[in-house]
Structures are given as C-alpha cells and as structure tokens.
Amino acid sequence: MDYDSYQHYFYDYDCGEDFYRSTAPSEDIWKKFELVPSPPTSPPWGLGPGAGDPAPGIGPPEPWPGGCTGDEAESRGHSKGWGRNYASIIRRDCMWSGFSARERLERAVSDRLAPGAPRGNPPKASAAPDCTPSLEAGNPAPAAPCPLGEPKTQACSGSESPSDSENEEIDVVTVEKRQSLGIRKPVTITVRADPLDPCMKHFHISIHQQQHNYAARFPPESCSQEEASERGPQEEVLERDAAGEKEDEEDEEIVSPPPVESEAAQSCHPKPVSSDTEDVTKRKNHNFLERKRRNDLRSRFLALRDQVPTLASCSKAPKVVILSKALEYLQALVGAEKRMATEKRQLRCRQQQLQKRIAYLTGY
C-alpha cells in the first residue's frame, strides 16, 4: 500500500482555508482515518525504566503499512502501535467518537468559558473510558508543544498532546480571534483516541455565535454570566456616580434660595397659549372654511338646475342628474348655434345677390 498515493483521500492539504468552517465530527467521519504522523515526543518503549509491553492485547509491533520509511523518527512512531488488532481499535474509536463528540465539545466549551477558570491554563477533561485502553509510559518526556515548523498537523489542530502519557486527554486550545468580529470565539479540539495508534484523529469545530452550527448546541449560560460579571463592576460604578450626583443636586436644591426675581418676571409676561387651544382654533377655522365651500357648491348646483328647462320644476334633483341634463342641454345649444351660423351665411349670400340684381336693374 503506497502512502503517498492515498494521502489525498485522508488529509486536506489546505487547512488554513478550511480552519473556520463549522464541520461536525459525525458529518466528516473520514477525518478519523487521516494518516498524519505524530511527532516522536516520547522515548522508545524499551529505554525508559519499567518499560514493558505496550498493551496487554497487542503483539509485537509491525512496520507501518505505508511508504513513509525514510524518516527514522516517524518510522519508530509508526511501528509502535500498529498491531494485529488495529482494525478493532479504529472501529471502536469511530463508534464511540460519533456518539460522544457533542458531549466532549459542550464540556470543553463550558470549561473554557467558565468565569472562574484561569485563562493561562486551559482545562483538560478526561476522555471516555471506552474509547482508549489505559497506558503507562515508562519515562514520559516533559510536555512541550509542537514547533511552528511542523507541517499539516500544526495547521489543522493548533496543538497536539505533547507526550503519550497525555494521550487520554483532550487539549482545548484557544485560536487567535479575528479582528473583524470580536464575538466569534473559535475553539479547536484535538483528540487522540488510541495512544498506540499513530493515526492522529483530528477534527476542528469553530464555534461562533453568529454562525449556526447544527452539530453543537448553544454555549451554556456561563458565557452570559461571564459578560454579566465583566459588566457588573462598571455598572456598579456608574450607578454609584449617578447616585452621588443625585444627592449633590438634592443638596443644591435645598440650599439654594427660591428664585424670586424669575417668578416676578413670569407673572408680568402672559402665559403662552397651550397646544390644546391652538388645536381648537385651527379646527374651528377649518370647519368654517369647509362649511363655506359646501354652501358655495350647493348654490352653484341650484343655479345650474334653474338654467336647465327640464329640471326647473324638480327641486330635489340629485347632482348627477343635474350634471347630465346640463350637458345634454349644452350640446343642444351648441348644435343650434352652428345651425344658425350656417343659416346666417346663406342669408348674407342671398342678400349680396339681391343687391347686385337691384344695381343692375337701376342701371337701365
């Protein structure tokens, strides 16, 4: 089995771009099979005092099945835990991590956001007992984070478990917050389910209050309590200052003499008209103008009705009837005017012809 030929199936090379993506462990289960070599931070099993078998159920170590045999340190780390029962270990890890991922995340976030927890040392919660068998290292090396030059593992996880004695713990590391949004608090969780398994199980979940994560619930009320505890002292100081200012104002009001001159000046000037009286006067003016407009309109309709011959005797004719009859009467008058104009032109032509006839007869 060639390790390089199948590496792109198990590991994402562009981890920086995918860092703030909210991906649940259960949704991306192939991340649990990514073949990432862990740094050799612990001494070999045979060198430390009290070193024995790595685990009671694992036989002699076999070489790493991939093709990464060039580096001695990596081959040493690969050959330690990859025994005959690696398939059962992977199956048990996948089964239990799928169920307990949400509980781990919630417990880690609640411990991280607790108001009483120190910020320098992140809290560590023990992993589920069914996930990994217990292991006692012979001579564990002192805890030290991985250097910044580590490829792939540092970019994805943020930090790793420094020694094999801490393989059963979950390291919660706070990632640098983005400057654009102060509310967003990404949390990266790195889990090594099996201390003898060189395959590092990575999954990172960015928890943001503005971006909904369907795999995780809202953070507990400890976040709101922390904000309240931060705002509490400031609010108390502001309330004390406000109370002190009120007491000073009351003292000044008691000590200061009554303003006699201002009261006398106010008594001399008439009081301004209130807004109620202004509204009443405006309403009266509006009603008067509206009544006048209606009376004028009614009188005009009555005059138009009197001009129409067919409606002169109808005292209660509606306005629509008055307008329609007036239109018909107007059209009739216009037609009669045109007819009379044509008759007038004809009569004038006839007159001119008669005058010429008379002039012709008188010439003889």
UniProtKB/Swiss-Prot annotation:
Domain bHLH intervals: 281-333
Cellular compartment(s): Nucleus
Upper taxonomic lineage: Eukaryota, Metazoa, Chordata, Craniata, Vertebrata
The protein's name: Protein L-Myc
CDD domains per record: bHLHzip_L-Myc
Nucleus as UniProt keyword: yes
Subunit annotation: Efficient DNA binding requires dimerization with another bHLH protein. Binds DNA as a heterodimer with MAX.
Pfam family, one: HLH
The keyword DNA-binding appears for this protein: yes
Ranges of compositional bias, category Basic and acidic residues: 228-245
MF annotations from Gene Ontology: DNA binding; DNA-binding transcription factor activity, RNA polymerase II-specific; protein dimerization activity; RNA polymerase II cis-regulatory region sequence-specific DNA binding
GO biological process terms held by the UniProt record: regulation of inner ear auditory receptor cell differentiation; regulation of transcription by RNA polymerase II
Sorted UniProt keywords: DNA-binding, Nucleus
Region spans: Disordered: 41-81, 111-172, 219-285
SMART domains named among the record's database cross-references: HLH
